[in-house]
Amino acid sequence: MSFIQSQDPAIWDAIQAETTRQQDGLEMIASENYTSPAIMEAVGSILTNKYAEGYPGRRYYGGCEHVDVVETIAIDRAKELFGAEAANVQPHSGSQANAAVYLSCLEVGDTVLGLDLAQGGHLTHGMKLNMSGRLYNFVNYGVDKVNHRLDFDQIVKLAREHKPKLIVAGASAYPREIPHDRFKEIADEVGAKLMVDMAHYAGLVAAKIHNSPVPYADYVTTTTHKTLRGPRSGLIMCKEEHLKLVNRNVFPGTQGGPLMHVVAGKAICFAEAMTEEYAHYGQAVVDNAKTLADTLLSCGLRLVSGGTDNHLMLVDVTAVDLGGKKAEAVLDACGITVNMNMIPFDQRKPMDPSGIRIGTPALTTRGMGGDEMKRIGQWIYNALSDSDNAALHESIRTEIREMVQAFPVPAAAESPATVA
């Protein structure tokens, strides 16, 4: 019997229900994935008991000799994986990583260029309610009105006009590969530093499917889950000359003690991402996304930018007379989990936008391929085009339950928290 089951039945029941949801359905939120059993074991290890404020060899607590080894391994592996000069593995999240970089190179009120949240950016790229938009003068760039790809004519114009101290590249809902070299050219022209937030596509960079921002950017931030398949956490990489300020603005600037059990999980994640198996995985993620996108297009759905280069796509569900909120609910009834999402130049409200965001990282981790993507694409179209047909939705849900039996969720069977 699990310790959780015997000690806290209410939490146990919730974990069991979530396990069933993950196993019986299709997880297609682009930012979600499954970690390996080794990473889950590390995150649940005895390292969670240890406080370790400071950095390896320079701690404010005793007894850190073993966690120093863990953190040093994580740093070295991050640098090797991405070819970075320096790395900080302590950020608790991607947002914390971004905040630390901002503190390292900006003063309150400084001007920054970042992608508009409504056109694919992230909250930390200048959203007015976020700390980034409250502390700094963010000027937003966007995408072209016709092809929905980054509008570099606009980016150049804004950079020349506003002379930002920092340019932020990266996105949370942009289905195309980002040309980091182009951003570097613009940053150099106007004398700005360049930060790339590759949280969504870091795994594709690690697998050498997408171009790396590391040679071009002063700072690179990322989460370690999503396409990297690690624990939920963050990472900063930078030029060696920036490391001292980055370290200072992670600790003590924005955080206290690091989560050493999560740092261990990150170290394992970085090692996994250097394997040949992982390179195949990265390619499969992109191949699956393109197959799914092609299927949806052939059914008559509209995709932002006409398709995808990476792990995600944005579907304009107004083509089937739906809003994103109902589309999300309809697919959820079928056992397909996605999220409603704004699309470029959206005329609807953020809480009921025109689109949904769909991703393939989690399903690819489960071992699904092109044949499954074609079936899933057809299910998505059938459900959305007959959105009030509860019987159809239940039928799709049954078919999905049957299909996924051949694709178990990694780590679920090994975790004591999911075994009665």
Curated annotation (Swiss-Prot):
Origin species: Rhodopirellula baltica (strain DSM 10527 / NCIMB 13988 / SH1)
List of residues that carry N6-(pyridoxal phosphate)lysine: K226
UniProt-listed PANTHER family: SERINE HYDROXYMETHYLTRANSFERASE, SERINE HYDROXYMETHYLTRANSFERASE 1
The gene coding this protein: glyA
NCBIfam families according to UniProt: PRK00011.1 (NF000586)
Family from the record: Belongs to the SHMT family.
Pathway assigned to this chain's UniProt record: One-carbon metabolism; tetrahydrofolate interconversion; Amino-acid biosynthesis; glycine biosynthesis; glycine from L-serine: step 1/1
Annotated localization: Cytoplasm
Biological processes annotated in GO: glycine biosynthetic process from serine; tetrahydrofolate interconversion; tetrahydrofolate metabolic process
Disulfide bonds, paired cysteine numbers: none
Reaction it catalyzes: (6R)-5,10-methylene-5,6,7,8-tetrahydrofolate + glycine + H2O = (6S)-5,6,7,8-tetrahydrofolate + L-serine
Binding site for (6S)-5,6,7,8-tetrahydrofolate: L117, G121, H122, L123
Name this polypeptide is given: Serine hydroxymethyltransferase
GO MF annotation terms: glycine hydroxymethyltransferase activity; pyridoxal phosphate binding
Superkingdom, natural source: Bacteria
Residues with site note (Plays an important role in substrate specificity): H225
InterPro entries: PyrdxlP-dep_Trfase (IPR015424), PyrdxlP-dep_Trfase_major (IPR015421), PyrdxlP-dep_Trfase_small (IPR015422), Ser_HO-MeTrfase (IPR001085), Ser_HO-MeTrfase-like (IPR049943), Ser_HO-MeTrfase_PLP_BS (IPR019798), SHMT-like_dom (IPR039429)
Entry EC no(s): 2.1.2.1
Any Gene Ontology CC annotation: cytoplasm
CDD domains noted in UniProt: SHMT
Cofactor: pyridoxal 5'-phosphate
Main localization of the protein described in the UniProt heading: cytoplasm
